[in-house]
Amino acid sequence: MASKAPRPPEAIAAIATAPGRGGIGVVRVSGAGLTGFAQQLCGREPQPRLATLARFRDADGATIDEGILLYFPAPASFTGEDVLELQGHGGPVVMQMLLARCLALGARLAEPGEFTRRAFLNGKLDLAQAEAVADLIEASTAAAARSALRSLSGQFSEEVLRIRDALIDLRMLVEATIDFPEEEVEFLDKGRALPRLAAIRTQLDALLDRARQGALLRTGMNVVLVGRPNVGKSSLLNQLAGEDRAIVTDVAGTTRDALREAIQIEGIPLHVIDTAGLRQTSDVVERIGIERTWREVERADVVLRVIDSEGAEEDALEAELAARCPSAAARITVVNKIDLLGLAPERTETAGAVRLRLSARSGDGVDLLRTELLRAAGWHAHGEDVVLARERHLLALREALDHLAAAEAAASALELFAEELRLAQEALAGITGEFSADDLLGEIFSRFCIGK
């Protein structure tokens, strides 16, 4: 019995531009054989890759809108299928009418990320590049956008594939030595295998470091300001933000709730959180604010404990901070109001404990704090080498490194050595999507915009 021909992909459609009003709105359609679709919609056959002025018509022939029709025939399109882009006036009613007409012609509403998923399934993008599409859209800083664009262009994937290919070459020689022990030719000995393995580990370590920097660009850090009332936390937030975001008064307890401000330092997004001053109080509202302060501390990446240069330090508060802070969080003590004592800005470090002297009022020493925040984040600029990475990429790179370390330990047993190389290769393949479970793909693409 002859096998059935594969069913052509059903057409999908979605509004590709952001909701709201604008000069231009775009409806995107992807599927098979869209020339007939365009003829019914516009009354003419579309010309490939040519911007054509067209009238978009409803089922009765009435004009919905007049705009630009673009047609990209398969496989030379974003999705690898026939793609139509209908550029009309960007009003929400017009866009909905145009989308409804596309659905009436047989397309179905695209799921989130379905256009990009089809591009991945049709080999137009690998999985890391597909994720970079969403990361570029969501980038909150120029540095993050540039890094996402490098990943989208394939730079991250190419480096992963280079390391994977080096692993394959080494595996090939190891397995040939195992499979053909009777051959007079020695394919590989331990003395040559370990230097090659060390070179691969060095490349992978460097890529992981750059990927960590990229992950920082993508997610940023939570920086929480804590301390007693009226020590200058809100003034410090305003200095970091470069504008007056928090109310500053001489009245203790002015800040009752957490105030969040997004700032950038060298392209790194920081989420700085000013909190209610920590003290014993009978005020119900203030107590709620203090409870929220501790909740913010418990999920902080960096805790800035602000103290007054004229005030006494309190061991009890320091002990509670130590108990409540996440173990991985950095803690920095900021001695504020040095202008009142005529002191100079300064950074000191004793047994790993960092202490900064500054004035939030004048701004003296705040640059020391900015530098310290970058240091706490582990940021060291790589210029144009940073690639935007996700947590799953970091996990895969670490897993591959763990297998390479295990391979080195098992170098005397070639079968175990080869197996660890295979597992390292498999971990890297998960980054680009060579080996990816359907549920992982569904999770990744479900986070995209509808029109992507």
Curated annotation (Swiss-Prot):
<feature type="binding site">
    <location>
        <position position="249"/>
    </location>
    <ligand>
        <name>K(+)</name>
    </ligand>
</feature>
<feature type="binding site">
    <location>
        <begin position="274"/>
        <end position="277"/>
    </location>
    <ligand>
        <name>GTP</name>
    </ligand>
</feature>
<keyword id="KW-0378">Hydrolase</keyword>
<dbReference type="Pfam" id="PF10396">
    <property type="entry name" value="TrmE_N"/>
</dbReference>
<dbReference type="InterPro" id="IPR027368">
    <property type="entry name" value="MnmE_dom2"/>
</dbReference>
<dbReference type="GO" id="GO:0002098">
    <property type="term" value="P:tRNA wobble uridine modification"/>
</dbReference>
<feature type="binding site">
    <location>
        <begin position="230"/>
        <end position="235"/>
    </location>
    <ligand>
        <name>GTP</name>
    </ligand>
</feature>
<dbReference type="Pfam" id="PF12631">
    <property type="entry name" value="MnmE_helical"/>
</dbReference>
<dbReference type="GO" id="GO:0005829">
    <property type="term" value="C:cytosol"/>
</dbReference>
<dbReference type="GO" id="GO:0030488">
    <property type="term" value="P:tRNA methylation"/>
</dbReference>
<dbReference type="InterPro" id="IPR027417">
    <property type="entry name" value="P-loop_NTPase"/>
</dbReference>
<feature type="binding site">
    <location>
        <position position="230"/>
    </location>
    <ligand>
        <name>K(+)</name>
    </ligand>
</feature>
<dbReference type="Pfam" id="PF01926">
    <property type="entry name" value="MMR_HSR1"/>
</dbReference>
<keyword id="KW-0342">GTP-binding</keyword>
<dbReference type="InterPro" id="IPR025867">
    <property type="entry name" value="MnmE_helical"/>
</dbReference>
<feature type="binding site">
    <location>
        <position position="124"/>
    </location>
    <ligand>
        <name>(6S)-5-formyl-5,6,7,8-tetrahydrofolate</name>
    </ligand>
</feature>
<comment type="function">
    <text>Exhibits a very high intrinsic GTPase hydrolysis rate. Involved in the addition of a carboxymethylaminomethyl (cmnm) group at the wobble position (U34) of certain tRNAs, forming tRNA-cmnm(5)s(2)U34.</text>
</comment>
<dbReference type="InterPro" id="IPR018948">
    <property type="entry name" value="GTP-bd_TrmE_N"/>
</dbReference>
<dbReference type="InterPro" id="IPR006073">
    <property type="entry name" value="GTP-bd"/>
</dbReference>
<dbReference type="InterPro" id="IPR004520">
    <property type="entry name" value="GTPase_MnmE"/>
</dbReference>
<keyword id="KW-0819">tRNA processing</keyword>
<feature type="binding site">
    <location>
        <position position="234"/>
    </location>
    <ligand>
        <name>Mg(2+)</name>
    </ligand>
</feature>
<feature type="binding site">
    <location>
        <begin position="359"/>
        <end position="361"/>
    </location>
    <ligand>
        <name>GTP</name>
    </ligand>
</feature>
<dbReference type="InterPro" id="IPR005225">
    <property type="entry name" value="Small_GTP-bd"/>
</dbReference>
<feature type="binding site">
    <location>
        <position position="251"/>
    </location>
    <ligand>
        <name>K(+)</name>
    </ligand>
</feature>
<keyword id="KW-0479">Metal-binding</keyword>
<dbReference type="GO" id="GO:0046872">
    <property type="term" value="F:metal ion binding"/>
</dbReference>
<dbReference type="GO" id="GO:0003924">
    <property type="term" value="F:GTPase activity"/>
</dbReference>
<protein>
    <recommendedName>
        <fullName>tRNA modification GTPase MnmE</fullName>
        <ecNumber>3.6.-.-</ecNumber>
    </recommendedName>
</protein>
<feature type="binding site">
    <location>
        <position position="28"/>
    </location>
    <ligand>
        <name>(6S)-5-formyl-5,6,7,8-tetrahydrofolate</name>
    </ligand>
</feature>
<keyword id="KW-0460">Magnesium</keyword>
<feature type="binding site">
    <location>
        <position position="254"/>
    </location>
    <ligand>
        <name>K(+)</name>
    </ligand>
</feature>
<comment type="subunit">
    <text>Homodimer. Heterotetramer of two MnmE and two MnmG subunits.</text>
</comment>
<feature type="binding site">
    <location>
        <position position="452"/>
    </location>
    <ligand>
        <name>(6S)-5-formyl-5,6,7,8-tetrahydrofolate</name>
    </ligand>
</feature>
<comment type="similarity">
    <text>Belongs to the TRAFAC class TrmE-Era-EngA-EngB-Septin-like GTPase superfamily. TrmE GTPase family.</text>
</comment>
<feature type="domain" description="TrmE-type G">
    <location>
        <begin position="220"/>
        <end position="378"/>
    </location>
</feature>
<feature type="binding site">
    <location>
        <position position="85"/>
    </location>
    <ligand>
        <name>(6S)-5-formyl-5,6,7,8-tetrahydrofolate</name>
    </ligand>
</feature>
<keyword id="KW-0547">Nucleotide-binding</keyword>
<keyword id="KW-0963">Cytoplasm</keyword>
<dbReference type="InterPro" id="IPR027266">
    <property type="entry name" value="TrmE/GcvT_dom1"/>
</dbReference>
<dbReference type="GO" id="GO:0005525">
    <property type="term" value="F:GTP binding"/>
</dbReference>
<feature type="binding site">
    <location>
        <begin position="249"/>
        <end position="255"/>
    </location>
    <ligand>
        <name>GTP</name>
    </ligand>
</feature>
